[in-house]
Amino acid sequence: MRGLLCWPVLLLLLQPWETQLQLTGPRCHTGPLDLVFVIDSSRSVRPFEFETMRQFLMGLLRGLNVGPNATRVGVIQYSSQVQSVFPLRAFSRREDMERAIRDLVPLAQGTMTGLAIQYAMNVAFSVAEGARPPEERVPRVAVIVTDGRPQDRVAEVAAQARARGIEIYAVGVQRADVGSLRAMASPPLDEHVFLVESFDLIQEFGLQFQSRLCGKDQCAEGGHGCQHQCVNAWAMFHCTCNPGYKLAADNKSCLAIDLCAEGTHGCEHHCVNSPGSYFCHCQVGFVLQQDQRSCRAIDYCSFGNHSCQHECVSTPGGPRCHCREGHDLQPDGRSCQVRDLCNGVDHGCEFQCVSEGLSYRCLCPEGRQLQADGKSCNRCREGHVDLVLLVDGSKSVRPQNFELVKRFVNQIVDFLDVSPEGTRVGLVQFSSRVRTEFPLGRYGTAAEVKQAVLAVEYMERGTMTGLALRHMVEHSFSEAQGARPRALNVPRVGLVFTDGRSQDDISVWAARAKEEGIVMYAVGVGKAVEAELREIASEPAELHVSYAPDFGTMTHLLENLRGSICPEEGISAGTELRSPCECESLVEFQGRTLGALESLTLNLAQLTARLEDLENQLANQK
């Protein structure tokens, strides 16, 4: 009958199962495979027949390459119900699978084959049970072993399983219904339907089934993995190597016979093995001598094409230029520039650092004197001010630059008289949102403020400067946040640091801040927009807007900011002109000078008008 493999009792013509189990060498290598056995354990299967089926399963396992990345095996048994013996994910060792099969107890009820196929399709071959995902394209194979006619329908559910990519082998024993076997199996039927006359012959089917899974010529299939040569044998193979090589421990790779390992090569640096021979090789930056064993360093500087401005140093990787002390190598790798110690060291200058050869010195602004420590300058007169710093923490600033901003803020704090009665300092960071790092009333000393500044964490994200200005106006200068009452006439100063264009509108709250009497300063770095800086700052912009091309040069702004933020306590009604080096006196001096100029300008205009009137009268008399 076409499509049906009958197994007559011709044991002498077939190799016994036990002989197959004793074969040595590599096991069957089918590649990755998800294999589920569906075993009929209904009451019609007698105990000794079930034991034969148990031995059949264990024998078939011994011929498979079992492992998480090779063949995964699951077993289910069924009668009137379905029971999972072990899923695909349960075991990766053959010994554990055999132990579970030995403990298998038959269910001894009806024969619901369709129910078993449905369970295999929906549960046993699910990813949760250990089947590999469909995108990995690992074949899914079900082997159904039954001895009777199903008591439910199998054709429709088997078709669904095949449509999901499950390849079905149907093995019938003794009284099995041939029509049901054909309805379950995958095409071509003559390769997927087997009929065994008795349980005694089911082991002989195992040989044929294993041969069908494994193929006959593993070397020809190309999956053997031999590096040099594959020698095929029945259901097995072994690898050999070309002359001059030996087989590695994995029995697939080939290693050159290492003549270098004998230690008689005489190579100064490296010995490189080749089939039947060897040669010497030097490290990078060295050349092999005529004796083909010793090595000499290459003097790249002697070639005369290094173009180094100061000195050339030969290294194994090639020529390297080196600069004399007090100079730094430039990005071109050749030229040298005098080192700017002010940018390269923590100089500690309060105002300005000036590099001088291999050293540096600190400078103070006009009207202020350098102190004995050679770094600090005498302070402006102590005064009262509430100062809120708005710091841009957007992603464009970047973490390393944010640290420079914090250092810059602390340099401003250094020249302030920080105390509850003197200058109070608050800090707000903004990006896509606004966060008060510490309010005006929290810290009473400069040391506490500086420590809190260093602890501020970088926010990243966007640049909502308008939102930050609103927060400052509505919250930061409130008495609840530590600002002093307006009745005390303590100046309120806002200082904004930003490096880019705001992502929201700033005009409303920039104007509102000035209406509230807040003196606004704007410090821009890098790509900061000048128009926005001017809109934020108070008038005149020349005194309230500062700009630096990058974060590394912000320290040059300190002198102007220190002179500008120094508090004003109001102009005295007296006419005495005090030293303009003091902030209050300087403002008073400038104010009175501007007032005098305005008065002179008005008088000049009036005098000019009177002269024009006299000229007109004289012209009329003539």
From Swiss-Prot:
A molecular-function term among this protein's GO annotations: calcium ion binding
SUPFAM superfamilies: Chicken cartilage matrix protein, Growth factor receptor domain, vWA-like
Xref: PROSITE patterns: ASX_HYDROXYL, EGF_2, EGF_3, VWFA
Keywords: Coiled coil, Disulfide bond, EGF-like domain, Glycoprotein, Repeat, Secreted, Signal
GO annotations of cellular component type: collagen-containing extracellular matrix; extracellular region; matrilin complex
Subcellular location as annotated: Secreted
Domain annotation VWFA: ranges: 34-213, 386-561
Disulphide-bridged cysteine pairs: C219-C230, C226-C239, C241-C254, C260-C271, C267-C280, C282-C295, C301-C312, C308-C321, C323-C336, C342-C353, C349-C362, C364-C377
Functional note: Major component of the extracellular matrix of cartilage.
Subunit and interaction comment: Interacts with COMP.
Name of the protein described by the UniProt record: Matrilin-4
Source organism of this protein record: Homo sapiens (Human)
